[in-house]
Each structure stands twice: as structure tokens, then as C-alpha cells.
Design a protein with these regions (language model features):
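Short, basic, alpha-helical segments at the C-terminal edge of helix-turn-helix-like DNA-binding modules
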Residues: 71-77
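Helix-turn-helix
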Residues: 2, 22, 26, 30-64, ...
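Hydrophobic alpha-helical connector segments
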Residues: 68, 82-115, 167-174
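Arg/Lys-rich, glycine/proline-spaced intrinsically disordered segments
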Residues: 11-15
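Short, solvent-exposed amphipathic helices
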Residues: 76, 132-143, 150
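C-terminal peripheral helix-coil segments that are non-catalytic and often amphipathic
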Residues: 1-10, 98-109, 142-146, 150-154, ...
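Amphipathic alpha-helical segments used for helix-helix packing
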Residues: 94-95, 110-132
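Hydrophobic alpha-helical segments that form the core
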Residues: 115-121, 163-184, 197-203
Length: 207
């Protein structure tokens, strides 16, 4: 009698493990450098070390990946903003300079290369025709203005600003200056010059 031998299952290689946060960070850097439309999936795969099936499984398509990168950027940027503005015992001028310095540290890469604001640099063009990107961009700007307004209102209530100062208007002024700094950083203006723009903005706000 011939015995049927069970075929031994073929051993498969262990699936390659990816760190989703590290991959998202590398994808963000790719978008930051080339923009959403200018960054190909092949470039993202090369940056993350993931093939297309793995990339799709982890993040979905390129659009979904970009939205994740944009949301993560706003989260980190707003954390830095709130940390800079949080200490109520710090004078307003000092708090605002900490805010601008924190953003400048984001606008320059670890090796000192200027890259500006990820949201302003990559999302503003796409937001014209893409409602999802437009929504995430607008919400990030709204939260930034709200955080600045809350700190400026506190300063007015403590007598650091004129009693008739409008915190909402001053918040928009502060964020508009930040966006100008971001664009200038992207254009290659040196960090010292950008910080001087921030300092003068703080002087105007504090009166």
C-alpha cells in the first residue's frame, strides 16, 4: 500500500515590517520637497522603502496618504504653538517670540535647509480644486488663529495690550506674518532675517 504523505507547507518569508509613523514622516518629507502633484508614487516608495502594495495596504492611495501627512503636520505644528503660548506668567512679547522661534525650527530641516511651512507650501495650490485638502487646510488655519486669539485675549485682560485692542484682529495679523515668514523661508531668506521679521511683528502687536 502506498501511503499518502502530507505535503509539507512551503515556508514563506516573514512579511517585511514597516513602522507606519516613520514611513509617514518620510512620505511627508517627499511631499514637502516636491509638492503633492510633483511627487510620484515611485518617489514615495523609494523614500519609505515600501513597494506599492504595501503602501496601499498601509495608507491607501496617494491622496489619502497626503491628507494623513497634512493632518499630522497640523497636529505637530499646533502642539508647538500651544507649548509656546501656554505659560500664562510669561510676558506676551516673549510668548510670541517663542511661538515664532518654534515655527522657524519647523521651517528649516535638521541640516539647515529652508523648506517653509508644509501646509502653506504644498496645500494652498491643491486646495483650489480639492475640497478635502481645502477643508484640512482651513481647519488648521482656524485652530492656529484661535490659539493666538486666546493668548492675546489673556494679554489684553491682564493689561499687556490696550483695553480696546481686538484679539481676533491681532491674531490674524500674527498668523499672516507667520505665513509670510514661511513663504520667505521657502524662497531662501536666511533664518536670522526671518527672525527679525518676527521680532518686528511682535513689536507692532505689543505696541
Amino acid at each position: 500500500m502506498v501511503q499518502n504523505k502530507e505535503a509539507k507547507p512551503k515556508r514563506r518569508g516573514r512579511p517585511r515590517a514597516y513602522d507606519p509613523q516613520a514611513a509617514l514622516l518620510r512620505a511627508t518629507d517627499s511631499f514637502w520637497s516636491g509638492g503633492y502633484s510633483g511627487t510620484s508614487l515611485d518617489e514615495i516608495c523609494a523614500a519609505t522603502g515600501m513597494n506599492r502594495p504595501s503602501l496601499y495596504a498601509a495608507f491607501g492611495d496617494k491622496h489619502t496618504l497626503y491628507l494623513e501627512a497634512l493632518k499630522r503636520y497640523w497636529q505637530l505644528s499646533l502642539v508647538a504653538t500651544r507649548e509656546a503660548l501656554a505659560a500664562g506668567d510669561r510676558p506676551l512679547g516673549e510668548a510670541l517670540m517663542r511661538f515664532y522661534d518654534g515655527q522657524l525650527s519647523i521651517y528649516f530641516s535638521a541640516d539647515g535647509l529652508p523648506r517653509g511651512c508644509f501646509a502653506i507650501g504644498t496645500a494652498t495650490t491643491e486646495a483650489v480644486d480639492d475640497p478635502e485638502i481645502r477643508t484640512v487646510l482651513a481647519e488648521g488655519l482656524r485652530m492656529l488663529d484661535a490659539d493666538l486669539e486666546a493668548r492675546l485675549r489673556m494679554a489684553r485682560d491682564r493689561g499687556e495690550l490696550r483695553h480696546d485692542a481686538d484679539p481676533a484682529v491681532l491674531a490674524v495679523l500674527a498668523s499672516a506674518a507667520l505665513h509670510s515668514i514661511a513663504i520667505r523661508a521657502r524662497a531662501g531668506v536666511c533664518r536670522a532675517e526671518l527672525r527679525e521679521i518676527a521680532r518686528k511683528t511682535v513689536c507692532v502687536i505689543c505696541g
